[in-house]
Amino acid sequence: MDQKKTVRPFSMKDKIGYTLGDLGCCFTEQYRAMYLSIFYTLILQVNPFHVGILLLVTKIWDAVNDPIIGAIVDSRKATKGGKFIPWIRAFSFPMAVLCILGFVNVGNINYGLRLAYMFVTYVLYEALYTCVNVPFGTLSSVMTDDVSQRTALSRYRSLGGTIFMTVMVMIGPLFLYVDNQPVAGRFLMLACICAMLGLLCLQITCVWCKERVEVPERPQGEKLNYLHVLKEISHNKALLGVMFFSLTGMIGASVVNGLNTYLYKDFFGNVKIQAVSGMLSVLYAVLSFAITQPLANKFGKKEWCCMGAGFAAIVFGILFFFPVHNPVAFIVINGICYLGASGMQVLIWAMVNDAIDYHELQTGERNEGIVYSTYSFFRKLASAISGSLSNFVLGAIGYNVTAGAVQTAGVVNAIWKSYTGVYFLGYGIAVAILFFVYPLTKQKTAEMLTELKARRAAKESK
């Protein structure tokens, strides 16, 4: 891999390119996460229980698919274009097309055919997204092996999602709804815009991000023993900690996001108020981006995540018993909690890279693709559970999906209890897992990286 020797040094261009890559993924994946269930229930008039089952089944299959793709990526030798970038470049095109097809209004066809169309477009999109996201997530581990640069990449990656969520929370409710009712054609129009912008961002990532860390290639004829690697991964406490921490935290955050529109539409009585939250979230996002790395450097990634997310969990535990009916007051409280919990979202990718290093420390092999895709499996599992759970919650509380329906007082109160209760449990359990399972404190991370550098230097000197 001699071409690696002439690659330019790590720079701001890499950080911006990686930000754009995450933004590109979010343009399709997060748009779907925010509005596809709403599109299914309110536009296609599909029973929330049926939507929940569909999402659960397809997401579990998609999660199983992640380690398979990771193993395929690991088994392929690097080409002139790199090991991971060619995957992103090629599969981002069909992924964009499938994102658009998911928002085609098929509400007038037979109910069974409607479900079949939803299933096919959902499964195909997620398969293509995996072929983009697994190589993209692994890419940061070969862009640099410097700990501060990796933390910066994790921070800049989170910025991509933050930019998307900030803009979409402001634009979505204002554009997609007229007189508090969803408009089918606007969902498709926004899907087209998101798909094209996402494709553009990912193609820029392929040009601006460079692979620098030499990945040892397997000897000729030696095959990757997938089951052996999985057995080794099962002893990786760092990966186990970050997987289960992310699993529970993501379930909490995703269910809350899934109920967000219903909270503003039915509990507060005006879905457009959600746009105010989006505008204020710009300030919170800027503050989070500014403070997270200094706080992580001072206290450690694990330590700051526990403190911030723990604070947010306690606040929402109190809100469960004491509802806030003033939307402005709620938005402010929610924003303060976001600052606390944001460390978990910003630093998670740096912690995954640390888990890859921990795997190398234990086994002498990196296997970035499988390690990352195993983590991605748990993220997809969390997405499956949370995406289904928000729909199951709506079905369980008796939410009426009929166009223009007014929800009963009991349903409206249940939306609040579900929103705050899931937030408290999700983040509370996540903090406990991180504290008791994840071993890499600030000191232990520094010791691990020192040991790995010494080992690599010894290998190069032979």
Q: Model segments located where?
A:
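Membrane-embedded alpha-helical bundles of multi-pass transporters/translocases
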Residues: 2-462
